[in-house]
Swiss-Prot record:
It comes from the Bacteria. One of its GO terms (molecular function) is ABC-type vitamin B12 transporter activity. One of its GO terms (biological process) is cobalamin biosynthetic process. Catalyzes amidations at positions B, D, E, and G on adenosylcobyrinic A,C-diamide. NH(2) groups are provided by glutamine, and one molecule of ATP is hydrogenolyzed for each amidation. InterPro entries: Class_I_gatase-like, CobQ/CobB/MinD/ParA_Nub-bd_dom, CobQ_GATase1, CobQ_N, CobQ_synth, GATase_3, P-loop_NTPase. This is Cobyric acid synthase. The keyword Hydrolase does not apply. Residues 250-438 form the GATase cobBQ-type domain.
Amino acid sequence: MKFPFPTLMVQGTTSDAGKTTLVAALCRLLAQQGVRVVPFKPQNMALNSAVTADGGEIGRAQALQAVAAGLPPHTDMNPILLKPSSDTGAQVIIHGRARNDMNARDYHAYKPIAMQAVLESYGRLSAQYETVLVEGAGSPAEVNLRDRDIANMGFAEAVDCPVILVADIDRGGVFAHIIGTLACLSESERKRTIGFVINRFRGDISLLEPGLRWLEEQTGKPVLAVLPYLHGLFLDAEDAVEQTQTARGAFRIVVPVPPRISNHTDFDALRAHPDVDLQLIGPGQPIPAADLIILPGSKNTRGDLDWLIANGWREALIRHARYGGKIIGICGGYQMLGKTIADPQGVEGLPGISQGLALLDITTVLTPEKQLEQVHGMCAFADTDAAVSGYEIHMGLSEGEACSHPAFVIAGRPEGARSADDQILGSYLHGMFDTPSACSALLRWAGLDSDVAVDTARLREASLDRIAQAAQPLLDALCALDPPTA
C-alpha cells in the first residue's frame, strides 16, 4: 500500500513519549520500501548534538533519524537548535550556525523570525522528498507557549499537515494524558489529530483493549497501534544521560556528570563494552576507585568547573592522577584539565578567567567562533597507528607545552594534548570511542588489554531494524487511512 501522507507529524503527550524513536522507525520502514523519506524537527532543545558534513550542527535525534532513512544528516532536518547554557538561557543555532545566546523571554519574541527559518527548511525538504516525517517537541498541550508556537501545532497549522499523538503507557496515566492533551488543543488542532499510538506496552493486550475502545468512543479517533516495550536498544539518547549498561566488566571507568554535560553519547561504546564497568557519578557522590576517569564535554565549561570543584571532585581527580590513574578530558573536560580558562568576551557568561585543574600544561581562551567539523585521523599515543573518526564542536583555543604531545593527528595536524608522564590525555574530539580501533587503543593506553571491539554503527543499525519491525503495524494502519484532501 502507498503511504498516503506527503507530510506527517508525530507529537507526544509528554517529553520522552517515544517521538524520536517512532519517527526513526517509520523512516526506516519507508526507506526499505523505496520511499524517498526525510526526517524533520522544526525546533529542538538538546545539549547532545551532531555535526553535518557541511559543518553545521543539528540535534542528535535528527542525525539518528537520517541514518534510519539512509541519508546523510543535513541542517535542514533541524533548522532551530537550542543548547541551554543556564536555567534561563540558551545558545540559538539556526540552519546549523550559532547566532547568539537568548533568555527565554527574548527567544519567545524572536520566534516569528525563527519560524521563517523553519518554513524555509521545510520547503526545501518537501520539494526534494516524497514524504517528510516531522517530530514535535515536548507536548502540544503547553498552553502557556501556544502563542508563537513553532515546534508543535503551530508548525502543523502553518503547513496544514496531519498529526498522530503518541503516549507512553509505561509511565502510567496514558488515557488521562491523551484526553487531557486533546482538551488543551483548539478545535482545528484536534481535527488534524488523526489517531493515537500507545507506546512501551508490556503485558496482556486483552486487558488493555477495553480501555482502547473507551478511548476511541470518547474521542472519535482511532488507536492506530500499540507498540511494545523494547529492551536493550542501542540508540543515541538526546536528553537525559543514559544510566543503564548492557555489560559490566572488571575495568572501571568513572564519568563525573556536571549539570551542563554535552554529547554524553561519547560513552555509548563504553557502555556496551563487555570488559568495562562504566559508572556515571552525580552530585553528592564521591568518585570511587577507578582505572580511568573521563571528564565529559560541557556547554558551560567555567560554570561546570566551579560546580565540579564545589562538589569536592578536584581533590579526587588530583589524587587519582598522583597514584598513577589515567584521565581523559573531552572538549570542555579537556579545557578543565589545563591551567586556566579565560573568557575575555563573555562567551559563556560574565568575562573572566578560571583556574583549571592544572593536570595538563595548557591554557584555554574561549572565543565566539564555534569550530564544527567531522574529522578523521590517527591515534598519536602508545605507539599505535589506529584510525579514529569523530567530530569537533567547541568554542576556544587550547595551547601549551602538553600540545607538543598530541592525542591524535587529524588531517596532518596535531590535535589534543598529553601530560609528560602520559597519565593525562585531552582532546576536542567527540566520538573518539566510536571507532573500534581507536576505542581499543584508548582502553589499552588506560590499562585494559582486550581484543574486544564494540561496533557502535552495527549495534545502531540492528536497533533501527528492531524498532522498524515493531512499528510495522503502525505503518499498515497509516497506509489504510484515506489520503488527505487538498
